[in-house]
């Protein structure tokens, strides 16, 4: 446990280090933060914080920088304060859904970019899991003689678009007939479905197309639960370039792999969660990930992540995510 004065000094060191990217000395602390104590007292308190492993000295500077443990203590205090705050929730996602004609993928793509522009960090948005949602309708639209667009409408009102190649050109009337058949059979995806398809179709090519349609639809819905939309990838590269060029490649490999999806899906809490450095992975000591949930409605929800260097503006990011519903 640290004293109130030590906490104030630690907060000042963290915030100055994040703002300026340089180790912080006692003289700088007094000048920037109007601390009403002597430089000797500040140095003594900093020595105590260093002994507790909250700050550390670099070889090239007489100042101190926050350790991972120091960042963790600082973040825990922020999270504790945030949990007691009442904020007006933003429903930007619902606006984006309407603007994108209820196409979830398009809305999430815009959402990831907007979050990145606001936070000035790289963002990831995980596609919601449709297990709690029910397919209401399937519409087929002929884009050209050999390409059909399948529009899947869920009970929540959300829409997914899937491109489907066709070996033969179907008329619009035939596609409407197939759409109605598939929609009517949505609740009957069982062992009798294949018999129904055989009875319904008028050619082997129709049978092949309908089976392909059903398999594609099921695979798309399953795969979408693992889809991740990234915004502002270059922001992470720029931030890491300033601190540690050698760390960029393993970090990019991590956030572009299934491991990041697994990490985000494992965080099921609706509360804001912060993982710092090695808490994420032993090879990722230079980044932090702040996660939260977003909602389209009470049942359809997914994960948001903001990724940046360990010297992140945590307060700004936490306040931003705390306002998202």
Swiss-Prot record:
Keyword set includes Transcription: yes
Domain of life: Bacteria
Any one of the GO BP annotations: negative regulation of DNA-templated transcription
Gene Ontology MF terms: DNA binding
Keywords per UniProt: Repressor, Stress response, Transcription, Transcription regulation
Signal peptide (residue range): none
Xref: Pfam families: HrcA
Entry protein name: Heat-inducible transcription repressor HrcA
Encoding gene, per UniProt annotation: hrcA
């Amino acid at each position: 446990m640290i004293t109130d004065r030590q906490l104030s000094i630690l907060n000042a060191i963290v915030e100055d280090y994040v703002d300026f990217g340089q180790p912080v000395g006692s003289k700088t602390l007094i000048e920037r933060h109007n601390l009403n104590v002597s430089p000797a007292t500040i140095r003594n308190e900093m020595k105590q914080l260093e002994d507790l492993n909250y700050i550390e000295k670099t070889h090239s500077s007489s100042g101190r920088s926050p350790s991972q443990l120091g960042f963790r203590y600082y973040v825990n205090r922020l999270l504790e304060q945030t949990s007691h705050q009442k904020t007006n929730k933003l429903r930007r996602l619902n606006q984006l859904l309407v603007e994108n004609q209820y196409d979830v993928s398009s809305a999430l793509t815009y959402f990831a970019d907007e979050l990145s522009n606001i936070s000035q960090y790289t963002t990831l948005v995980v596609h919601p899991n449709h297990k709690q949602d029910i397919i209401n309708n399937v519409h087929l639209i002929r884009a050209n003689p050999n390409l059909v667009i399948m529009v899947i409408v869920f009970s929540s009102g959300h829409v997914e678009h899937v491109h489907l190649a066709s070996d033969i050109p179907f008329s619009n009337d035939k596609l409407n007939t197939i759409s109605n058949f598939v929609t009517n059979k949505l609740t009957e995806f069982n062992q009798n479905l294949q018999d129904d398809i055989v009875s319904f179709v008028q050619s082997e090519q129709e049978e092949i197309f309908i089976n392909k349609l059903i398999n594609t639809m099921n695979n798309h819905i399953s795969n979408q639960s693992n889809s991740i939309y990234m915004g502002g990838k270059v922001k992470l590269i720029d931030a890491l370039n300033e601190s540690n060029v050698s760390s960029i490649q393993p970090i990019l490999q991590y956030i572009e792999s299934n491991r990041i999806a697994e990490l985000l899906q494992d965080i099921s809490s609706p509360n804001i969660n912060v993982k710092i450095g090695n808490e994420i992975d032993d090879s990722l000591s230079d980044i932090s990930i702040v996660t939260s949930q977003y909602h389209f409605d009470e049942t359809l929800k997914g994960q948001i992540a903001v990724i940046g260097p360990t010297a992140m503006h945590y307060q700004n990011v936490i306040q931003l995510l705390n306002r998202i519903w």
